[in-house]
A protein has these predicted regions:
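Auxiliary alpha/beta "docking" domains used to position bulky ligands
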Residues: 1-169
């Protein structure tokens, strides 16, 4: 395992570079110890749930959503990535309008494959490192962790926004 601080910084740098190599537009790493920002986002979720704004979506109540340690025991950090969904396919249909993110292959599959490639790379670089893939179907505050990782901020529209890509990821 990596013991020296400089080694941790180096592997973090290489990991983000690997994510960019795999086709992600942005990548950042957040420490699980979190910050006041994660606590604020978790508190906001708890208020939202207590007001029953989630209605029938009982899956939103998962404790794993509030405590990443329940999702992946012994986790130390989160790699957050952003994948742009602007593509060359144009919706020239003037009758039907289709959301950009839904044009093309299912992004869950595309992103999962790219993250799995990063996982294989991790296995080679840090053999004793455990990892788990979460693509926005896991009980994880993914936007809050991405914000904590520094790849963007959560805007008034509740989307994650980056300086480079806006909210197109």
């Amino acid at each position: 395992m990596i013991d020296k601080i400089q080694d941790k910084k180096e592997i973090s740098k290489k990991l983000k570079e690997r994510a960019i190599f795999e086709g992600f537009a942005v990548a950042g790493i957040a420490s699980i110890s979190g910050s006041s920002r994660i606590k604020l986002r978790t508190n906001a979720l708890e208020r939202w749930l207590s007001n029953n704004y989630h209605a029938e979506m009982k899956w939103m109540e998962s404790e794993k959503r509030k405590n990443i340690g329940l999702l992946f025991e012994d986790a130390k950090s989160v790699l957050s990535v952003g994948f742009t969904y602007i593509n060359s396919q144009n919706n020239n249909n003037n009758f039907l309008k289709v959301a950009k993110f839904s044009q093309g292959e299912d992004y869950h599959k595309v992103i999962h494959k790219k993250l799995k490639n990063i996982g294989k790379w991790i296995n080679l670089e840090i053999p004793d490192c455990k990892w788990k893939i979460c693509v926005d179907t896991s009980p994880l505050l993914e936007k809050a962790w991405a914000e904590e990782a520094g790849i963007g901020w959560i805007g008034k529209n509740s989307n994650l926004i980056s300086k480079k890509n806006g909210s197109w990821f």
